[in-house]
Amino acid sequence: MKPIKHYKNKWDRFTIIMTTLVLIVITIAVIALYCEGGLWHQVTATVLLLFAIIPIFLRPLSTSYDGEKLIVRFLCYKKVYSLSQYTPVYIEHFSTTKAVRIFASGGYFGYWGIWRMHLNGRDRWDTLHSYTTSRKEDCILLMPKEESKHKVLLNADGRWFTTTD
């Protein structure tokens, strides 16, 4: 059995700036709304707090690899991808400029969620599930061996798939 390898997700500069700015704006808005008082102000402040808190549970924390499967860990759960069902492809970085967010974050706590984008220079839209916090480095695209499965983008060490132990 191969040893388990771990990769702690790094944040790129845009993710750090975006997350910090959004949290500052939400904090100021929540304080202002609660100081105003009134039911609608408190409801709006609560919705803003939920907007700030829920992504903490959706962003990936780390990725592990045991030679047979990739495990993406989140705060309260994990997703397991068997490499018998996917082919890993290392990509230099992925661009979100021509991508459409279906239910996704474009930098707030990373680039997680469901995206529609052109992959590998193909001239058709692909749907992919992204669990990344950096789009500049260590991006792995899991291409399904069966058409019925979705494509997955995550951060992991590209050397895991190019060297033999």
What function would you assign to each model-found segment?
Residues 64, 80, 153-155:
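Short aromatic/basic micro-patch
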Residues 2-3, 73-148:
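Non-transmembrane, membrane-adjacent beta-strand/coil modules in membrane-associated proteins
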Residues 1-36, 141, 148-150:
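N-terminal membrane-targeting/pre-transmembrane regions
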Residues 143-165:
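Cytosol-/stroma-facing membrane-proximal "stalk/adaptor" domains immediately downstream
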Residues 30, 52-53:
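Alpha-helical transmembrane segments of multipass membrane proteins
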Residues 34-48:
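Hydrophobic alpha-helical transmembrane segments
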Residues 53-77:
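Transmembrane-cytosolic junction motif
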Residues 17, 81-85, 162-165:
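A short, polar/proline- and glycine-enriched secondary-structure boundary/capping micro-motif
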